[in-house]
Amino acid sequence: MKRSNFIKYGLTVLTASAALLGAGGTARAADRKPNIVFIMGDDIGMWNIGAYSRGMMAGTTPNLDRMAKEGMLFTDYYAEASCTAGRANFITGELPIRTGMTTVGQAGAAIGLPAEACTIATALKAQGYATGQFGKNHLGDKNEFLPTVHGFDEFFGYLYHLDAMEDPFHPNYPQNLLNVVGPRNLIHSWATDTDDPTEMPRWGKIGKQKIEDDGPLPPHPMAGIKYNMETIDDTIIADSLAFMDQAKAANKPFFVWINPTRMHVVTHLSPKYAAMMNSQNGWSIEEAGMAEVDDEVGSVMQHLKDMGVDDNTIVVFTTDNGTESFTWPDGGTTPFAQCKGTVMEGGFRVPCILRWPGHVPADSVQNGIFSGLDWFPTFLNAAGNPNITDQLLKGVTLGDRTYKNHLDGYDQMAAITGNGPSARHEIFYLGESTIGAVRIDDYKYRFIDQPQGWLGVKNHPDVPTITNLRLDPFERLGFPEDMTKQGSLMFMGDWYMYQFWRFVFVQQMMGKEIQTFLAYPPMQRGASFNLDALKAEMAAKMAQAEAAAKGAGQ
């Protein structure tokens, strides 16, 4: 299917979705509903954006800096520790331990976005929105997990971490296993009203979507292959802009989730951006890659202006997880402790910039606690349905499915418009399926130590660490290994002794959260690279088999 044929296949679905304006929706004109553009970079370092680092870094990001000047910059914005979890966090508004999307998704894995999970796209489609997703997905590669059966009208992109797409091009990759364990190719898909029963090997039933295979994604241009990592972002951005144009032509407000490849490893720059690294500016590959990210943001902002809709469009720029610094200089920079994959601030606290003229105060800084979870109810409020949280708690039909879910996000409309404080007081830091830390207002209680970072051992000390993130945002203080009071660490020992009483708040918070899991159980067991859970399950099944065998022999 040619890209221009979206009008033939996609607008049929868009027109049909106009009938789904129930569940608190209204039939307001499209120009009264804000368009929503959510740009989610990959592994972006907070300090690699000029608006945050204030010139401390060599690179420049003029478009992102302008966006911050015209909108709001967040200092206490939280994603998740890894990409799958961070993307599920945003699109479902639920903690990843509810959806089971807790760690990096692998090719052919049985775990993906559950059918029971309601997405922002599904809820916005019920409000009359055209919904498109372009670029990285990483929420499962089987057909049942694709975006176009989870509320999106159109999807183009890839389904894993970027380097997974590069695996088959390594000289030692066993090509005879490519169709057994290899990554799925780039996908272009469209939602349809027809349920296609066709079963695809490895990927399952097609369902209510049309799917095209757009080929592999090699690191560099290759004869006979359509796309490559050097320039794939050009197509991701172009398709995103084309979708906006088509939605406007159909008089539809649009929600577009843009997911460029940068700055995930391995960074393969086009000649244009590779040439930006020179002896005059001292740039590394990270600065050159961030220049590409910034140009992409500039292209989106200029296109919205050319369309005449920039003043009625919510634009958010953020990233999926804490920056990945262990492959530096092909890695980002953060002022916070540790990086991606840990429960330290560097694993969760990420950049976020919001622009919405006439609603979000220009050149403002938001110091309240925010989470990627919060966009679901906030966007729905902006779209005309402020009741989505209560509706999902009770059960609501959206499209052809009834959902009953516990949103963990808060409606932050008052905070982003300057009319009140953040509605959020807590952050749960998930180390895959384990709660590794909790933040309650200014205080963080950490139960896991990861001194070697994501790739190292997780220690579970008997005594957790308490940090006041307003006094020590970079988590510089802690106990010395020999538990003696030495130097600056003396403050931590005395201070900790007089703050220990605060753990009662953690107990209360955890008790309250556990109750929600009793009423709204997890949809599936979360994935993990730790085999302990799998070994325990295998042992339990072996015990069941032995018991059954004994019973049969009696």
Language-model segments: residues:
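Formylglycine-dependent sulfatase
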Residues: K2-P464, L469, P473-E475, P480-Q554
